[in-house]
UniProtKB/Swiss-Prot annotation:
The keyword Secreted applies. This is NU-theraphotoxin-Preg1a. GO terms for cellular component: extracellular region. GO terms for molecular function: toxin activity. The lineage of its organism: Eukaryota, Metazoa, Ecdysozoa, Arthropoda, Chelicerata. Expressed by the venom gland. It comes from Poecilotheria regalis. Toxin that acts as an agonist on melanocortin receptors (MC1R, MC3R, MC5R, MC5R). After binding to MC1R, the peptide activates the hMC1R/Gs pathway, but after binding to MC4R, it is not able to activate or antagonize the MC4R/Gs pathway. Inhibits melanocyte stimulating hormone (MSH)-binding to human receptors (Ki=1.8 uM to MC1R, Ki=19.8 uM to MC3R, Ki=7.1 uM to MC4R, Ki=10.0 uM to MC5R). This toxin is structurally unrelated to the natural agonists. It is found in: Secreted. Its main location: secreted.
Length: 28
């Protein structure tokens, strides 16, 4: 399970990581 592009993120360490990377508080 991971967050898709456009989802809000707080950084590399979070409960559900981004599928890609976290940039400007948004998953890319």
């Amino acid at each position: 399970r991971c967050l898709h592009a456009g989802a809000a993120c707080s950084g590399p360490i979070q409960k559900i990581p981004c599928c890609g990377t976290c940039s400007r508080r948004k998953c890319t």
